[in-house]
Amino acid sequence: MKKYILNILIFILFTSLSNSQNLDSLYVSRINDTILSKYLNEKRSIEIQLPRSYEANPDKKYPLMIVLDGDYMFNIVAGSVDYLSYWGDIPENLIVGINQKDTRFKDSSVLDNITHTPITSTASFYDFIVNEVIPYFSKNYRISKFRVILGQERTANFANFFLLKKNPVFQAVISISPKMSKNMNSYLSENLSKTNSKIIYTLSSSKKDFESIYKNVSELKNSLDSINNKNLKFESLIFDEENHYILPSLSVPKSIRSTYSMYSDIDKIEYDSIISNLEISPIDYLTNRYQLIKDFYDEDKTISMNDFMAIEEYIEENEFFDFYNDLSQLAKQEYPGTILPSYYRGRFIEETGDPKKAMYIYRSAYNMKEVKGLTKEYLLELANRIEEDFNY
Protein backbone atom coordinates (compact mmCIF):
# COMPACT_ATOMS: atom_id res chain seq x y z
CA MET A 1 0.00 0.00 0.00
CA LYS A 2 2.86 2.41 0.73
CA LYS A 3 4.04 2.06 -2.84
CA TYR A 4 0.61 3.01 -4.15
CA ILE A 5 0.40 6.08 -1.90
CA LEU A 6 3.88 7.20 -2.95
CA ASN A 7 2.82 7.02 -6.59
CA ILE A 8 -0.39 8.90 -5.84
CA LEU A 9 1.54 11.72 -4.19
CA ILE A 10 3.84 11.90 -7.19
CA PHE A 11 0.80 12.07 -9.49
CA ILE A 12 -0.76 14.88 -7.43
CA LEU A 13 2.47 16.86 -7.59
CA PHE A 14 2.71 16.23 -11.32
CA THR A 15 -0.82 17.36 -12.06
CA SER A 16 -0.40 20.47 -9.90
CA LEU A 17 2.67 21.46 -11.88
CA SER A 18 0.89 20.69 -15.14
CA ASN A 19 -2.07 23.02 -14.65
CA SER A 20 -0.41 25.73 -16.72
CA GLN A 21 0.51 23.53 -19.66
CA ASN A 22 -2.62 24.25 -21.68
CA LEU A 23 -2.13 28.02 -21.37
CA ASP A 24 1.61 28.62 -21.39
CA SER A 25 1.79 28.99 -25.18
CA LEU A 26 -1.20 31.37 -25.30
CA TYR A 27 -1.42 35.05 -24.46
CA VAL A 28 -4.09 37.45 -23.29
CA SER A 29 -5.48 40.02 -25.71
CA ARG A 30 -6.44 43.54 -24.68
CA ILE A 31 -8.93 45.70 -26.52
CA ASN A 32 -9.81 49.37 -26.02
CA ASP A 33 -13.42 50.06 -26.90
CA THR A 34 -16.28 52.47 -26.27
CA ILE A 35 -19.98 51.96 -25.67
CA LEU A 36 -22.37 54.65 -26.87
CA SER A 37 -24.86 54.93 -24.02
CA LYS A 38 -28.36 56.35 -24.21
CA TYR A 39 -28.47 56.31 -20.41
CA LEU A 40 -25.27 58.30 -19.95
CA ASN A 41 -25.72 60.41 -23.09
CA GLU A 42 -22.08 59.83 -23.98
CA LYS A 43 -19.54 57.33 -25.18
CA ARG A 44 -17.95 55.53 -22.24
CA SER A 45 -14.45 54.10 -22.58
CA ILE A 46 -13.91 50.48 -21.59
CA GLU A 47 -10.91 48.18 -21.61
CA ILE A 48 -11.25 44.46 -22.26
CA GLN A 49 -8.94 41.57 -21.51
CA LEU A 50 -9.78 38.35 -23.32
CA PRO A 51 -8.80 35.02 -21.74
CA ARG A 52 -5.70 33.31 -23.07
CA SER A 53 -7.70 30.45 -24.52
CA TYR A 54 -10.45 32.63 -26.03
CA GLU A 55 -9.44 32.14 -29.68
CA ALA A 56 -8.26 28.55 -29.20
CA ASN A 57 -11.59 27.41 -27.66
CA PRO A 58 -14.31 28.87 -29.90
CA ASP A 59 -17.10 26.96 -28.14
CA LYS A 60 -16.17 27.90 -24.59
CA LYS A 61 -18.00 30.57 -22.60
CA TYR A 62 -16.26 32.56 -19.87
CA PRO A 63 -17.34 34.34 -16.68
CA LEU A 64 -17.69 38.11 -17.09
CA MET A 65 -15.88 40.26 -14.53
CA ILE A 66 -16.72 43.97 -14.58
CA VAL A 67 -14.18 46.25 -12.91
CA LEU A 68 -15.40 49.62 -11.70
CA ASP A 69 -12.82 52.40 -11.48
CA GLY A 70 -11.27 50.67 -14.46
CA ASP A 71 -8.97 53.62 -15.07
CA TYR A 72 -6.79 52.51 -12.13
CA MET A 73 -8.16 49.13 -11.00
CA PHE A 74 -8.20 47.30 -14.33
CA ASN A 75 -4.53 46.34 -14.49
CA ILE A 76 -4.32 44.86 -11.01
CA VAL A 77 -7.53 42.87 -11.52
CA ALA A 78 -6.64 41.69 -15.02
CA GLY A 79 -3.15 40.66 -13.93
CA SER A 80 -4.45 38.79 -10.89
CA VAL A 81 -7.07 36.90 -12.90
CA ASP A 82 -4.57 35.95 -15.59
CA TYR A 83 -2.04 34.71 -13.03
CA LEU A 84 -4.53 32.72 -10.94
CA SER A 85 -6.21 31.16 -13.98
CA TYR A 86 -2.83 30.31 -15.52
CA TRP A 87 -2.17 28.01 -12.55
CA GLY A 88 -5.70 26.62 -12.54
CA ASP A 89 -6.83 28.12 -9.21
CA ILE A 90 -9.70 29.96 -10.90
CA PRO A 91 -11.36 29.75 -14.32
CA GLU A 92 -10.34 32.18 -17.02
CA ASN A 93 -12.50 35.32 -17.04
CA LEU A 94 -13.33 37.96 -19.59
CA ILE A 95 -12.40 41.21 -17.84
CA VAL A 96 -14.04 44.57 -18.56
CA GLY A 97 -12.80 47.78 -16.98
CA ILE A 98 -15.12 50.80 -17.07
CA ASN A 99 -13.35 54.15 -17.12
CA GLN A 100 -14.68 56.44 -14.37
CA LYS A 101 -11.78 58.87 -14.10
CA ASP A 102 -13.90 62.03 -14.22
CA THR A 103 -17.30 60.56 -13.39
CA ARG A 104 -16.73 58.54 -10.24
CA PHE A 105 -18.97 60.54 -7.92
CA LYS A 106 -21.89 61.03 -10.31
CA ASP A 107 -21.68 57.39 -11.40
CA SER A 108 -21.74 55.91 -7.93
CA SER A 109 -22.76 58.34 -5.19
CA VAL A 110 -25.85 60.36 -6.17
CA LEU A 111 -28.44 58.86 -3.85
CA ASP A 112 -31.94 59.63 -2.65
CA ASN A 113 -31.98 61.54 0.64
CA ILE A 114 -34.59 59.24 2.15
CA THR A 115 -34.00 55.74 0.76
CA HIS A 116 -30.29 56.30 0.01
CA THR A 117 -30.62 54.38 -3.25
CA PRO A 118 -29.42 55.50 -6.71
CA ILE A 119 -31.14 58.43 -8.43
CA THR A 120 -30.40 60.62 -11.49
CA SER A 121 -26.84 60.05 -12.77
CA THR A 122 -26.12 57.08 -10.49
CA ALA A 123 -29.39 55.39 -11.46
CA SER A 124 -28.41 56.01 -15.09
CA PHE A 125 -25.02 54.40 -14.54
CA TYR A 126 -26.76 51.41 -12.92
CA ASP A 127 -29.00 51.09 -15.99
CA PHE A 128 -25.98 51.50 -18.26
CA ILE A 129 -24.39 48.41 -16.73
CA VAL A 130 -27.56 46.31 -16.64
CA ASN A 131 -29.11 47.30 -19.96
CA GLU A 132 -26.09 48.17 -22.10
CA VAL A 133 -22.80 46.75 -20.83
CA ILE A 134 -23.98 43.22 -20.06
CA PRO A 135 -26.09 42.92 -23.25
CA TYR A 136 -23.17 44.27 -25.31
CA PHE A 137 -20.91 41.49 -24.08
CA SER A 138 -23.63 38.86 -24.28
CA LYS A 139 -24.09 39.74 -27.95
CA ASN A 140 -20.49 40.24 -29.03
CA TYR A 141 -18.49 37.90 -26.79
CA ARG A 142 -18.83 34.41 -25.40
CA ILE A 143 -19.75 34.91 -21.76
CA SER A 144 -21.35 32.49 -19.31
CA LYS A 145 -24.16 33.22 -16.89
CA PHE A 146 -21.70 33.82 -14.04
CA ARG A 147 -20.90 37.50 -13.59
CA VAL A 148 -18.69 39.31 -11.10
CA ILE A 149 -18.50 43.02 -10.30
CA LEU A 150 -15.67 44.61 -8.35
CA GLY A 151 -15.26 48.09 -6.90
CA GLN A 152 -13.33 50.09 -4.33
CA GLU A 153 -14.59 52.70 -1.87
CA ARG A 154 -17.49 54.59 -3.56
CA THR A 155 -17.83 52.09 -6.38
CA ALA A 156 -17.65 49.20 -3.90
CA ASN A 157 -20.69 50.62 -2.17
CA PHE A 158 -22.37 51.13 -5.54
CA ALA A 159 -21.73 47.48 -6.48
CA ASN A 160 -23.71 46.43 -3.41
CA PHE A 161 -26.90 47.82 -4.93
CA PHE A 162 -26.92 44.98 -7.45
CA LEU A 163 -27.47 42.55 -4.56
CA LEU A 164 -30.67 44.27 -3.48
CA LYS A 165 -32.67 42.96 -6.43
CA LYS A 166 -34.69 39.74 -6.23
CA ASN A 167 -32.76 38.23 -9.16
CA PRO A 168 -29.34 39.91 -9.15
CA VAL A 169 -27.60 40.30 -12.52
CA PHE A 170 -24.30 39.62 -10.74
CA GLN A 171 -23.70 36.38 -8.90
CA ALA A 172 -20.57 37.67 -7.16
CA VAL A 173 -19.61 41.04 -5.71
CA ILE A 174 -16.12 41.97 -4.56
CA SER A 175 -16.37 44.97 -2.26
CA ILE A 176 -12.99 46.51 -1.38
CA SER A 177 -12.92 49.12 1.38
CA PRO A 178 -16.50 50.25 0.66
CA LYS A 179 -17.62 53.71 1.67
CA MET A 180 -21.02 52.58 2.87
CA SER A 181 -24.07 54.71 2.22
CA LYS A 182 -26.68 55.05 4.91
CA ASN A 183 -28.82 51.92 5.41
CA MET A 184 -26.55 49.79 3.22
CA ASN A 185 -25.60 47.44 6.05
CA SER A 186 -29.22 46.73 6.90
CA TYR A 187 -30.19 46.48 3.21
CA LEU A 188 -27.50 43.87 2.58
CA SER A 189 -28.21 41.89 5.73
CA GLU A 190 -31.91 41.72 4.99
CA ASN A 191 -31.55 40.76 1.33
CA LEU A 192 -28.70 38.29 1.67
CA SER A 193 -30.36 36.49 4.57
CA LYS A 194 -33.31 35.51 2.40
CA THR A 195 -31.91 35.42 -1.13
CA ASN A 196 -32.86 32.41 -3.23
CA SER A 197 -30.11 33.16 -5.74
CA LYS A 198 -26.60 31.76 -5.41
CA ILE A 199 -24.51 34.73 -4.24
CA ILE A 200 -20.80 35.06 -3.47
CA TYR A 201 -19.92 38.19 -1.51
CA THR A 202 -16.37 39.14 -0.58
CA LEU A 203 -15.76 42.12 1.69
CA SER A 204 -12.41 43.62 2.67
CA SER A 205 -10.89 46.40 4.72
CA SER A 206 -7.91 46.99 7.00
CA LYS A 207 -7.29 48.10 10.56
CA LYS A 208 -5.31 50.96 8.99
CA ASP A 209 -8.16 51.84 6.61
CA PHE A 210 -10.14 55.05 7.08
CA GLU A 211 -11.73 54.73 10.51
CA SER A 212 -15.33 55.13 9.34
CA ILE A 213 -14.87 52.53 6.59
CA TYR A 214 -13.24 50.00 8.89
CA LYS A 215 -15.99 50.50 11.47
CA ASN A 216 -18.81 49.99 8.94
CA VAL A 217 -17.11 47.01 7.34
CA SER A 218 -16.60 45.39 10.76
CA GLU A 219 -20.28 45.87 11.60
CA LEU A 220 -21.37 44.44 8.26
CA LYS A 221 -18.98 41.52 8.67
CA ASN A 222 -20.49 40.64 12.05
CA SER A 223 -23.98 40.87 10.64
CA LEU A 224 -23.31 38.72 7.57
CA ASP A 225 -21.33 36.16 9.56
CA SER A 226 -24.51 35.39 11.49
CA ILE A 227 -26.57 34.65 8.37
CA ASN A 228 -27.48 31.00 7.82
CA ASN A 229 -28.36 30.76 4.15
CA LYS A 230 -26.96 27.97 1.97
CA ASN A 231 -27.29 30.23 -1.08
CA LEU A 232 -24.84 32.77 0.33
CA LYS A 233 -21.10 32.32 0.36
CA PHE A 234 -19.61 35.20 2.34
CA GLU A 235 -16.01 35.87 3.23
CA SER A 236 -14.40 38.90 4.84
CA LEU A 237 -10.74 39.84 4.57
CA ILE A 238 -9.47 42.15 7.29
CA PHE A 239 -5.83 43.16 6.90
CA ASP A 240 -3.62 44.53 9.67
CA GLU A 241 -1.20 47.06 8.23
CA GLU A 242 -2.32 48.19 4.77
CA ASN A 243 -3.72 51.70 4.39
CA HIS A 244 -6.69 52.64 2.22
CA TYR A 245 -4.65 53.10 -0.94
CA ILE A 246 -2.36 50.08 -0.62
CA LEU A 247 -5.20 47.74 0.33
CA PRO A 248 -6.34 46.86 -3.23
CA SER A 249 -2.91 45.49 -4.12
CA LEU A 250 -3.42 42.72 -1.55
CA SER A 251 -7.18 42.50 -1.46
CA VAL A 252 -7.79 42.08 -5.20
CA PRO A 253 -5.96 38.75 -5.68
CA LYS A 254 -7.16 37.37 -2.35
CA SER A 255 -10.76 38.41 -3.02
CA ILE A 256 -10.73 36.92 -6.50
CA ARG A 257 -9.33 33.67 -5.16
CA SER A 258 -11.94 33.69 -2.40
CA THR A 259 -14.69 34.25 -4.97
CA TYR A 260 -13.56 31.12 -6.79
CA SER A 261 -12.54 29.12 -3.72
CA MET A 262 -14.88 26.26 -4.61
CA TYR A 263 -13.36 26.01 -8.08
CA SER A 264 -9.78 25.15 -7.22
CA ASP A 265 -8.52 21.58 -6.89
CA ILE A 266 -8.38 19.72 -3.59
CA ASP A 267 -5.31 20.80 -1.65
CA LYS A 268 -3.60 19.45 1.46
CA ILE A 269 -5.66 21.62 3.79
CA GLU A 270 -8.95 20.35 2.37
CA TYR A 271 -7.68 16.79 2.37
CA ASP A 272 -6.48 16.86 5.97
CA SER A 273 -9.40 18.79 7.44
CA ILE A 274 -12.34 17.38 5.46
CA ILE A 275 -11.62 14.38 3.27
CA SER A 276 -9.62 12.43 5.83
CA ASN A 277 -12.62 12.71 8.20
CA LEU A 278 -15.40 11.90 5.74
CA GLU A 279 -18.52 10.18 7.00
CA ILE A 280 -20.01 9.84 3.51
CA SER A 281 -18.79 8.13 0.37
CA PRO A 282 -15.69 9.90 -0.99
CA ILE A 283 -17.18 9.59 -4.47
CA ASP A 284 -20.34 11.36 -3.28
CA TYR A 285 -18.15 14.05 -1.75
CA LEU A 286 -16.32 14.54 -5.04
CA THR A 287 -19.46 14.68 -7.20
CA ASN A 288 -21.17 17.05 -4.73
CA ARG A 289 -18.09 19.28 -4.83
CA TYR A 290 -18.29 19.59 -8.60
CA GLN A 291 -22.04 20.10 -8.51
CA LEU A 292 -21.39 23.16 -6.32
CA ILE A 293 -19.04 24.47 -9.01
CA LYS A 294 -21.85 24.08 -11.52
CA ASP A 295 -24.45 25.64 -9.22
CA PHE A 296 -22.38 28.69 -8.27
CA TYR A 297 -20.18 29.28 -11.32
CA ASP A 298 -22.24 27.88 -14.21
CA GLU A 299 -19.15 25.85 -15.08
CA ASP A 300 -19.23 22.21 -16.19
CA LYS A 301 -15.74 21.52 -14.94
CA THR A 302 -14.22 18.14 -15.66
CA ILE A 303 -13.10 16.48 -12.44
CA SER A 304 -9.36 17.06 -12.33
CA MET A 305 -6.80 14.30 -12.17
CA ASN A 306 -5.55 15.91 -8.97
CA ASP A 307 -8.96 15.37 -7.36
CA PHE A 308 -9.26 11.79 -8.61
CA MET A 309 -5.86 11.07 -7.08
CA ALA A 310 -6.85 12.72 -3.80
CA ILE A 311 -9.81 10.35 -3.50
CA GLU A 312 -7.54 7.47 -4.48
CA GLU A 313 -5.18 8.42 -1.67
CA TYR A 314 -8.11 8.38 0.78
CA ILE A 315 -9.12 4.90 -0.42
CA GLU A 316 -5.58 3.56 -0.10
CA GLU A 317 -4.93 5.08 3.32
CA ASN A 318 -8.15 3.68 4.76
CA GLU A 319 -8.18 0.46 2.71
CA PHE A 320 -11.75 1.18 1.59
CA PHE A 321 -11.14 -0.66 -1.68
CA ASP A 322 -14.81 -1.20 -2.52
CA PHE A 323 -15.00 2.50 -3.41
CA TYR A 324 -12.71 1.85 -6.36
CA ASN A 325 -15.67 0.36 -8.24
CA ASP A 326 -17.65 3.60 -7.99
CA LEU A 327 -14.53 5.64 -8.74
CA SER A 328 -14.04 3.60 -11.90
CA GLN A 329 -17.58 4.44 -13.05
CA LEU A 330 -16.98 8.12 -12.37
CA ALA A 331 -13.67 7.99 -14.27
CA LYS A 332 -15.46 6.38 -17.23
CA GLN A 333 -17.89 9.29 -17.23
CA GLU A 334 -15.21 11.98 -16.94
CA TYR A 335 -12.36 10.44 -18.97
CA PRO A 336 -13.93 8.02 -21.47
CA GLY A 337 -11.54 6.15 -23.73
CA THR A 338 -8.61 6.56 -21.34
CA ILE A 339 -6.74 4.17 -19.08
CA LEU A 340 -8.15 5.76 -15.91
CA PRO A 341 -11.38 3.69 -15.62
CA SER A 342 -9.42 0.48 -16.22
CA TYR A 343 -6.86 1.46 -13.60
CA TYR A 344 -9.51 1.93 -10.91
CA ARG A 345 -11.48 -1.12 -12.03
CA GLY A 346 -8.28 -3.14 -11.84
CA ARG A 347 -7.53 -1.87 -8.34
CA PHE A 348 -11.05 -2.83 -7.23
CA ILE A 349 -10.76 -6.35 -8.68
CA GLU A 350 -7.21 -6.82 -7.37
CA GLU A 351 -8.01 -5.80 -3.81
CA THR A 352 -11.30 -7.71 -3.61
CA GLY A 353 -9.85 -11.09 -4.46
CA ASP A 354 -9.22 -11.67 -8.15
CA PRO A 355 -5.67 -10.50 -8.98
CA LYS A 356 -5.52 -12.55 -12.20
CA LYS A 357 -8.54 -10.74 -13.60
CA ALA A 358 -7.02 -7.43 -12.48
CA MET A 359 -3.84 -8.29 -14.38
CA TYR A 360 -5.84 -8.74 -17.59
CA ILE A 361 -7.71 -5.47 -16.99
CA TYR A 362 -4.45 -3.54 -16.57
CA ARG A 363 -3.06 -5.00 -19.78
CA SER A 364 -6.27 -4.49 -21.73
CA ALA A 365 -5.93 -0.73 -21.24
CA TYR A 366 -2.74 -0.54 -23.29
CA ASN A 367 -4.52 0.69 -26.44
CA MET A 368 -6.36 3.44 -24.58
CA LYS A 369 -5.26 7.04 -24.11
CA GLU A 370 -3.09 8.09 -21.19
CA VAL A 371 -4.06 10.82 -18.75
CA LYS A 372 -1.92 13.30 -16.85
CA GLY A 373 0.01 11.53 -14.13
CA LEU A 374 -0.94 8.00 -15.17
CA THR A 375 0.87 6.04 -17.89
CA LYS A 376 0.39 2.76 -19.73
CA GLU A 377 3.80 1.70 -18.50
CA TYR A 378 2.62 2.02 -14.90
CA LEU A 379 -0.39 -0.21 -15.56
CA LEU A 380 1.89 -2.78 -17.22
CA GLU A 381 4.12 -2.60 -14.17
CA LEU A 382 1.12 -3.41 -11.96
CA ALA A 383 0.19 -6.33 -14.23
CA ASN A 384 3.75 -7.67 -14.27
CA ARG A 385 4.00 -7.42 -10.51
CA ILE A 386 0.85 -9.53 -10.11
CA GLU A 387 2.18 -12.07 -12.60
CA GLU A 388 5.44 -12.38 -10.65
CA ASP A 389 3.79 -12.48 -7.22
CA PHE A 390 1.31 -15.22 -8.14
CA ASN A 391 3.38 -17.07 -10.78
CA TYR A 392 0.68 -16.72 -13.44
PLM features: residue spans?
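C-terminal catalytic histidine-bearing segment of alpha/beta-hydrolase fold enzymes
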Residues: N228-L292, Y297-D300
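The feature captures the conserved acid-bearing segment of alpha/beta-hydrolase catalytic domains
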Residues: S181-E242
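Primarily recognizes the serine-hydrolase "nucleophile elbow" in alpha/beta-hydrolase
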Residues: K145-L192
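Gly/Ser-rich "nucleophile elbow"/oxyanion-hole loop immediately N-terminal to the catalytic nucleophile
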Residues: E55, L111-Q152
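Active-site machinery of serine-nucleophile hydrolases
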Residues: D71-Y126
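Residue-level recognition of tetratricopeptide repeat
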Residues: E313, R347-E350, E381-E388
